[in-house]
């Protein structure tokens, strides 16, 4: 930075740096972070997951799913630079989502997407395709988006959720809850689902922000089982 390279300036204290200096001089060649707003309508196969990083930043991660023609029924196509743990979570989510459909729903899906001359798999895409993503905390969201696609039920757009998932449908503990929620509020989320196992973290969050306008009108729901998530999220 110029201010560090110029010895005649660095010896003068205090140093005054304005917001205008930061935007138009020192970081003029840097891209400004733009918070993408969530969708304004309920949709099938679209859910707001959540993310957080080690720097304390967080926000929403749109996760979308659609059927696509392929050689193997319900084969998964994964795009969006998911790393190994997240990809494994997607396979767990698919097994769970399929197991939760009724026999009647399974038959309808197979009659349409698993015929002799036409088979379909599921394409799952996570937003911000150029950014690597990993971790198991999107499991509940991925299960929900797959169940939505399989059953044709829409997902409420104002919700975001986080939580690891297992094959028995248990929603389990994650990290970075406060960063995920604060960033997602900026993106327009007004309702959150988080793991019951994170209740201590949630209480700490509420103690810190209970008098802050940032959480005015925001609803929070703990969940321990994926069915609780479905009951809240699905139209």
Feature annotation, model-predicted:
Residues 9-23, 28-48, 53-235:
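Peripheral, non-AAA+ core regions of ATP-driven protein-machinery
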Residues 1-5:
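C-terminal helical "lid" of AAA+/P-loop NTPase domains
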